[in-house]
Regions:
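Mature, structured domains enriched in cysteine- and short glycine motifs
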Residues: 155-156, 160-208
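Non-globular, low-confidence helical/coil segments that flank catalytic cores
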Residues: 1-168
Length: 208
């Protein structure tokens, strides 16, 4: 038996079909010394549902992708495969603000030596109102799209995803000087005279 293997170097904008789904390669958009930033990023669209896979890409390359595509790419996704096992080097605010996923799936081992998932990206996902599904809690996770909605099943029936409804309704505190916003429990809240309240994460984003 002879096995022939072909390799193909992708470039941003490459498209191919996967059954009835359309796959678009959206990154990386340049070369990097850091191997994690060379992860292939794929946008998978099936019907009106969208999945985004970012591999181990870090915030530097996330931001470069946003700059490269500008307004030519719709980053909104129903499901985000959270970058780098939910490391604090990935899933930055700017990138997450564009994607605004309904669901975030985190692949990681239980009690891993890296401390994943890190608190910072978890906080960002919660602030965005994302429902978080973790393999260390749920076991194997399967997402199924019918082209209109995405449904999930998981191995550990005794566990449930983290429901983000409360996070989506949290009041956020904006700093009128720095133009940044914080969750109410942040240790770096602005002085009262410089603060402004937003009723939701999206309201804070819309205010710039």
């Amino acid at each position: 038996e002879i096995v022939v293997t072909y390799t193909y170097e992708t470039i941003p904008g490459d498209e191919f079909s996967l059954g009835n789904a359309q796959v678009t390669v959206v990154g990386p958009v340049k070369s990097y010394a850091e191997p994690n930033n060379t992860s292939i990023v794929m946008r998978v669209a099936f019907g009106s549902t969208v999945f985004l896979f970012t591999g181990d890409m870090e915030t530097e390359a996330e931001n470069d992708m946003l700059d490269y595509w500008g307004d030519k790419m719709d980053w909104k996704a129903d499901v985000l495969k959270v970058g780098h096992h939910c490391s604090n080097t990935s899933t930055g605010y700017r990138f997450l603000n564009e994607v605004m996923p309904e669901y975030g799936v985190i692949s990681l081992g239980k009690d891993n030596s890296y401390g994943h998932p890190h608190a910072e990206p978890l906080s960002r996902l919660r602030q965005a109102g994302t429902v978080i599904l973790r393999t260390d809690e749920l076991g194997t996770i399967q997402a199924v799209s019918d082209g209109k909605t995405v449904t999930f099943t998981w191995e550990n029936q005794g566990a449930n995803p983290e429901n983000a409804e409360t996070a989506a309704q949290t009041v956020f505190i904006g700093n009128q000087k720095s133009r940044k916003f914080h969750s109410p429990d942040c240790a770096n809240l602005p002085a009262e005279k410089n603060s402004v309240e937003f009723s939701s994460y999206q309201a804070a984003i819309d205010a710039g």
